């Protein structure tokens, strides 16, 4: 083997070895932290609901025009006897579309929904409680430059009178954590 050929072969082997190692290192990196899940603790969720939810999980639901990240707890499972109402919290950073909360505040509540302003939750907050279509409670909060959207739905046998205080308590807990510069 000539020195030139040996050098080329050695370069090829080293390149393949180093590239594979670098790719493997890239795969071992931790995924970026989801900013939605830390907005609520398991203890806060269990205290507000009186149920044992366990940890929430980040989920990519294609956040739509406003972006953001979502964390979900509960929901429909394989065993209906163990189903818990679904609770979701979305952290929405500032974006080109403006405030998610202000956008929805400018719209009328949906058919079968009532709207109530919340005081002492973030800079601006309101709750929509819907009995008919999409039965559940939605809380919209503007806190600093960010928005929080909290949903309690898939209520199974629980009434809105159970869901609304749960949603408001969780929004009160999440709002200060979502306020970031």
Per-region residue spans from a language model:
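N-terminal secretory signal peptides that target proteins for export/translocation
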Residues: 1-4
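Bacterial N-terminal signal peptides
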Residues: 7-20
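Short, Lys/Arg-rich flexible segments
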Residues: 25-63, 87, 165-181
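A short, solvent-exposed beta-edge/loop patch
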Residues: 26-32, 112-181
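Functionally engaged cysteine thiol sites
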Residues: 37-38, 42, 69-71, 113, ...
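Secreted/processed peptides and extracellular or luminal domains of membrane proteins
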Residues: 42-43, 77, 119, 136
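Exposed alpha-helical structural elements
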Residues: 44, 99-103, 162, 166
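Short, solvent-exposed recognition patches
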Residues: 52-131
């Amino acid at each position: 083997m000539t020195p030139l050929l040996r050098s080329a072969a050695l370069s090829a082997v080293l390149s393949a070895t180093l590239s594979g190692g670098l790719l493997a290192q890239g795969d071992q990196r931790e995924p970026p932290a989801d900013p939605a899940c830390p907005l609520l603790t398991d203890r806060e969720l269990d205290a507000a609901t009186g149920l044992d939810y366990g940890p929430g999980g980040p989920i990519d639901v294609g956040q739509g025009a406003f972006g953001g990240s979502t964390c979900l707890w509960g929901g429909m499972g394989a065993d209906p006897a163990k189903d818990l109402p679904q609770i979701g919290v979305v952290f929405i950073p500032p974006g080109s579309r403006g405030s998610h909360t202000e956008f929805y505040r400018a719209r009328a509540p949906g058919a079968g929904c009532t709207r109530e302003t919340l005081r002492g939750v973030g800079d601006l907050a309101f709750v929509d409680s819907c009995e008919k279509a999409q039965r559940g409670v939605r809380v919209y909060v503007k806190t600093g430059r960010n928005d929080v959207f909290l949903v309690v739905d898939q209520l199974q046998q629980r009434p809105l009178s159970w869901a609304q205080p749960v949603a408001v308590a969780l929004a009160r807990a999440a709002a200060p954590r979502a306020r970031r510069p």
